[in-house]
Amino acid sequence: MAKKKSEEHSSADANDSDYQEEPNFDDPPNFVDNINDEDLLGDMLAQRPSEADGVESVVVVDNIPKVEPSRLEKLKSVILKVFSHCGEIVNVVYPVDDEGTTKGYAFMEYRHASQAEDAVKKLNNHRLDKNHTFAVNLFTDFQKYENIPEKWEPPTVQPFKIQNDLYNFINDPDAYDQYCVAAETAPNCVQVGFWQNTLPEPNELETRERFTDTFVKWSPLGTYVVTFHKPGVAIWGGSNFQKIQKFPHTGTQFVEFSPCENYLVTYGPTPTGQKIIIWDIRTGSEKRSFVADGMSVLSMFRWSHDDKFVARMGENSIHIYETPSFYLLDLKSIKIPGIRGFSWSPTDNVIAYWVEEQNQIPARVTLMEIPKKREIRNKNLFHVADCKLHWQKSGDYLCVKVDRYSKLKKDKKELDVKFLGMFYNFEIFHMREKEIPVDSVEIRELILAFAWEPIGNKFSIIHGELNSSNVSFYEVNKGVKPSLVKRLEKKSCTHLFWSPRGQFIVMANLTMGTFEFVDTTNDYIISASPDHFRASEVEWDPTGRYVVTGVSSWKVKEDTGFNMYTFQGRIIKRTILKNFVQFLWRPRPPTLLSEEKQKDIKKNLKKYYPAFEQKDRLRLTRASKELLEKRSQLRETFMEYRNKRIAEWKDQKSRRVMLRGHVDTDNLETEEVDEEIVEFLVKEEITLLE
């Protein structure tokens, strides 16, 4: 062992002698380093603690009521109640004059500087009463404004940036509609393609990889498309779908645009519930935020048709906020004991709400005019289990679907309530008639679906058993009770989708993937009955000419994609797309033509037919010509490639002959070929003979 160890040492010494001397990394004499600490350690110096004077957590509140010493304690309790929502208050100072009267402002110190910033953000311009609106500022802001130079310097002129045209999509001379198709390429990574529904084939406008984490949504007028990301949401628009604005709200799950696209509401989870933020779309600024217990009906905001008001339901109340200040209307909520649901008219500032039965008092449906808060119609209802409010798109009618019972059964503690002998009523409010008359339609069968005709005076319902239901169509006319005009029996459908232009309807079974296209003009003829197995969505285009059914990967993982049909149910296009997520038509803004001009165009529509037919023929001819030119170009490209390879093959002949033993194998005759037959055993079978 000793000998072996000594050998190892001698070997190590020999190896050490082979190594070169270690290099010297010391700076040469008189060397000057030109790198400063900011360049070398910038990221670390940015985290260096800075000196603080201790006033970062102090806010100054102006426009506080001036009160005498006898009322000071009451004032303190009111102010403390308002400002304590933003954090823990350490100290409050109310300066007073010689007589002890407050001077109208106060200094308030929070536990942390972030709480003071939150107080400025939330409570600045907070209205205490009719005569006092708080002006809240950080104490450090006064020092900042003191350091403003007295000599004014003109701002630097910024170069003009050409604004993106947000409405270019409606300037297409042929008025082709656009749509987007989303497909998931990886977890939390969705590709979105934007297309124009041109003839004979759609035209791809733009495709974005990793455009959103989950899904996309169009704004009501089609100006913007919103994408969802972990830090928040972003809206895009213009010819190339450039980013218009981003709204930081971590974990946003759902958004809602106001009807006129002035505001955006984002809903995101918090550890204790749901945070809701209302944003100004044009400026990107936060207008107001709310905290709710969870994602429920109580937390949802609903907008008036003109963006002037937004409302949400509270416990036994409705909170209506005015825009753009987002203060409560008349600085108070509307107290409505027992309210269970409400909805805005799509064309007027009228709210419909219903109240449940309480202590032998019947349920009630009320129409209230805003901002006057004047009740314009009431309807009492008895034996009510639930109500659903359905406005017609034109605002001409309101249908209240009433779930009624014959008998009520309660347990001993009255916690569990069972309704027996259920039947259903449809209360139809005629909004355009004097004193708003109400008609009633009673159905004794289970109601599976209800849908108004968007433009017209008909509504349809699915009633009966799920696998063998009936579809009934009713017509509503002035001064006459709603009449049953058609009943289609034994139809296996679960949903109803009216065309945006009325007249045509798709009766869909989204469980089995079957569809029936119906024309409701005269005889309610079923024009087509296609099927799309596992289809989970139906989308009409804004003009009512095309219908798309889709199989989303949210529902199944195989055979995802979408089919496109005409309004009569004729198949136009089948698209199989892996991990297809959603298909959305781009909405269109309302037409600028007057009612008289639209009627005149419809009346003289035959006059425009020849021009349209000629344009269609030219388009098809142009498409055929383009197809022939494309094929000719492909053939020329192939022949060019082929000739190039043949020339290369000829140039290599001498090399090829040399490698093949000086035998020209390119021109071998059949006689020079030796044919050899080889036989081998494939399988062996044994047959026993008797």
Swiss-Prot record:
Keywords from the UniProt entry = Coiled coil, Cytoplasm, Initiation factor, Protein biosynthesis, Repeat, RNA-binding, WD repeat
Q: Repeats (WD): which ranges? A: 207-246, 293-331, 334-369, 442-484, 530-575
Ranges for region Disordered: 1-33
Provide a GO CC annotation, any one: eukaryotic translation initiation factor 3 complex
Indicate, by first and last residue, each region the UniProt record lists as having compositional bias (Acidic residues): 15-25
Q: List the disulfide bonds.
A: none
Question: In its keyword annotation, does this UniProt entry include Nucleotide-binding?
Answer: no
Pfam families reported in the protein's UniProt record: eIF2A (PF08662), RRM_1 (PF00076)
**One GO BP:** regulation of translational initiation
Single GO molecular-function term?
Answer: translation initiation factor binding
Q: Which residues form a coiled coil?
A: 614-645
Question: What coarse category fits the chief subcellular location reported for this protein?
Answer: cytoplasm
InterPro entries in UniProt: EIF3B, eIF3B_RRM, Nucleotide-bd_a/b_plait_sf, RBD_domain_sf, RRM_dom, TIF_beta_prop-like, WD40/YVTN_repeat-like_dom_sf
Give the location in the cell: Cytoplasm
Q: Which portions of the chain have biased composition (kind: Basic and acidic residues)?
A: 1-11
- Superkingdom of source: Eukaryota
Q: Where is the RRM domain?
A: 57-141
Homology family: Belongs to the eIF-3 subunit B family.
Q: HAMAP family, per this entry?
A: eIF3b
Give a short account of what the protein does.
RNA-binding component of the eukaryotic translation initiation factor 3 (eIF-3) complex, which is involved in protein synthesis of a specialized repertoire of mRNAs and, together with other initiation factors, stimulates binding of mRNA and methionyl-tRNAi to the 40S ribosome. The eIF-3 complex specifically targets and initiates translation of a subset of mRNAs involved in cell proliferation.
Q: How does it assemble?
A: Component of the eukaryotic translation initiation factor 3 (eIF-3) complex. The eIF-3 complex interacts with pix. Interacts with mxt.
Query: What is this protein called in UniProt?
Result: Eukaryotic translation initiation factor 3 subunit B
